[in-house]
């Protein structure tokens, strides 16, 4: 039978396996993600303490040395000068969490072996708006650090009192030694309710991407069906293609904001700012897809399908939690990350619609794509002229 002689029939199992292999790779980053160089701020305001006839001690410095030795490569400890500097860094999404050692930490630790002990206090600050999974993990790490310090200090104090010949503890000492370090946990930039557990920026990506991809592909096929006979006409068609994209982008931006807010129920702090940002994002993606299709033709469509399947799992994770290959070679090339980063700043950091890094990147993508799209019209128009000249010369020769 001719059916079994067709090479595609015998190649179909191999093609099926390749498809399975490619799409299985999208799940790799989400299987037991582990952090690497997760930035956590540390403020050591400890002024130290000097007992009579003894050298000055600084327990805060010892704490820093201890946590740096035990954390390995999972955490990048960044020591900052003050709480204000740490909060400024969190506003700029530089740290997932922070640990504050107070100025009287050494003095209160030294008081634990006296008749009037006082518990020291450490503050754990969690920057929830950056990334839910990463900030939660960073907060758990810092809580573990404080718990280990509590146990270590309790053991040291008890051993010291035994060595001094103490046989019993006062009620005050027993109460303080139960928790020699009081832990205060503060959450900043909280996503709040109706935020998909902090993933609302990622939730908006898929519908916007599909709308931009579908509309760009539709206009591309409509343009391809038409015929152009001059360079000027080809340029006008490409300019019209870009102009139609403006209308589509406005519909996508304002429509998605309305659907997300009023139908899905996602909390959007500022409807107008969000709608304009989504419109700019959609237009940038529309131009990018149109430019690629103008160069590669319909062969370029699978590229954007793969970007969707590979990008969606990566966008839910912090870059520091991705495998090295994905972190260095996949994530930086995902244009949709600028959309998620921009929405995160608007939703959780109260930045509003401002000229920042994500908006700059999206604008740059759109401008470059528009230039490529118009150049493709110029080149295509030149081909049309050459084809007409060739046909005319052949007819004249004949």
Residue ranges and their predicted role:
Residues 2-196, 389-398:
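Extracytoplasmic/periplasmic domains immediately adjacent to an N-terminal transmembrane anchor
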Residues 78, 82, 175, 183, ...:
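Juxtamembrane loop-helix boundary motifs flanking transmembrane segments in multi-pass membrane proteins
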Residues 89, 257-258, 342-346:
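Solvent-exposed, amphipathic alpha-helical segments
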Residues 17-25, 252-254, 366-378:
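Hydrophobic core of alpha-helical transmembrane segments in multi-pass integral membrane proteins
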Residues 197-314:
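Transmembrane alpha-helical segments that form the functional core of multipass membrane systems
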Residues 10, 239-243, 360, 364:
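Internal alpha-helical transmembrane segments of multi-pass membrane proteins, especially GPCRs
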Residues 77, 205-210, 333-334:
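Tryptophan-centered motif/residue detector
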Residues 263-398:
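Membrane-spanning alpha-helical segments of multipass transporters and channels
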């Amino acid at each position: 039978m001719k059916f079994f002689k067709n090479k595609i029939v015998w190649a179909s199992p191999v093609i099926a396996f390749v498809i399975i292999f490619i799409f299985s790779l999208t799940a790799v980053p989400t299987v037991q993600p582990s952090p690497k160089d997760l930035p956590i701020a540390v403020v050591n305001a400890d002024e130290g303490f000097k007992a009579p006839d003894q050298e000055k001690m600084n327990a805060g410095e010892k704490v820093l040395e201890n946590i740096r030795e035990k954390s390995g490569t999972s955490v990048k400890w960044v020591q900052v000068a003050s709480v204000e500097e740490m909060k400024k860094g969190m506003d700029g999404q530089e740290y997932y969490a922070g640990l504050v050692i107070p100025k009287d930490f050494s003095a209160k630790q030294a008081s634990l072996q006296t008749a009037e002990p006082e518990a020291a206090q450490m503050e754990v600050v969690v920057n929830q708006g950056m990334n839910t999974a990463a900030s939660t993990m960073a907060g758990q790490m810092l809580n573990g650090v404080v718990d280990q310090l509590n146990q270590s200090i309790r053991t040291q104090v008890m051993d010291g009192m035994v060595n001094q010949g103490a046989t019993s503890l006062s009620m005050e000492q027993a109460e303080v030694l139960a928790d020699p370090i009081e832990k205060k946990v503060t959450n900043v930039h909280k996503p709040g309710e109706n935020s998909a557990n902090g993933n609302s920026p990622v939730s908006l990506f898929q519908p916007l991407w599909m709308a931009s991809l579908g509309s760009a592909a539709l206009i591309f096929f409509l343009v391809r069906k038409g015929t152009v006979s001059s360079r000027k006409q080809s340029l006008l068609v490409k300019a019209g293609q870009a102009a139609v994209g403006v209308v589509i982008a406005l519909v996508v931006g304002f429509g998605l904001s309305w659907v997300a807010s009023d139908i899905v129920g996602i909390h959007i702090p500022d409807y107008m700012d969000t709608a304009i940002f989504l419109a700019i994002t959609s237009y940038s993606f529309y131009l990018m897809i149109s430019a690629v299709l103008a160069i590669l033709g319909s062969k370029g469509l699978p590229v954007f399908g793969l970007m969707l399947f590979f990008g969606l799992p990566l966008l839910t994770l912090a870059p520091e939690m991705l495998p090295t290959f994905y972190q260095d070679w996949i994530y930086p090339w995902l244009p949709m990350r600028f959309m998620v980063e921009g929405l995160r700043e608007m939703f959780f950091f109260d930045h509003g619609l401002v000229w920042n890094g994500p908006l700059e990147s999206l604008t740059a993508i759109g401008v470059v794509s528009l230039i490529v799209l118009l150049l493709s019209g110029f080149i295509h128009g030149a081909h049309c002229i050459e084809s007409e000249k060739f046909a005319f010369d052949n007819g004249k020769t004949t």
